């Protein structure tokens, strides 16, 4: 199971290493600052696509996620740390 708090902390740490403010990173990713904050605080889990975009921006090796026992959620899987399931378009 994906640990949203660990993932969020990792993203936040890497963002700070790059000296990026939340507003700057969110704008570069095309998302709101509040959504990025929710990801960093473990309230929301990013989709695989969003996580890939974040990883590229902050030079995060996705293999690090495996080493820290964080599993990537596939599209259509769980989107919130609370376990709410996203609906897939048919």
Curated annotation (Swiss-Prot):
The UniProt keywords, alphabetically, are: DNA-binding
Domain HTH cro/C1-type, by residue range, is 11-65
DNA-binding region, residue range(s):
22-41
Q: Which PROSITE patterns match?
A: HTH_CROC1 (PS50943)
A molecular-function term among this protein's GO annotations = DNA binding
What is the originating organism of this protein?
A: Bacillus phage phi105
Return the PANTHER family for the record: DNA-BIDING PHAGE PROTEIN, TRACRIPTIONAL REGULATORY PROTEIN-RELATED-RELATED
Q: Which Pfam family, an example, fits this chain? A: HTH_3
Question: What is the protein name for this chain?
Answer: ImmF control region 10 kDa protein
SMART domains referenced in this protein's UniProt entry, alphabetically: HTH_XRE
Is Transport given among the entry's keywords?
no
């Amino acid at each position: 199971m994906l640990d949203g708090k660990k993932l969020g902390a990792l993203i936040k740490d890497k963002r700070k290493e790059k000296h990026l403010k939340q507003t700057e990173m969110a704008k570069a990713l095309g998302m709101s600052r509040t959504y990025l904050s929710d990801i960093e605080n473990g309230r929301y889990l990013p989709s695989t696509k969003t996580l890939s975009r974040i990883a590229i921006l902050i030079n995060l090796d996705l293999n690090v996620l495996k080493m820290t026992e964080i599993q990537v959620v596939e599209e259509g899987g769980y989107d919130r740390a609370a376990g709410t399931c996203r609906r897939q378009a048919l």
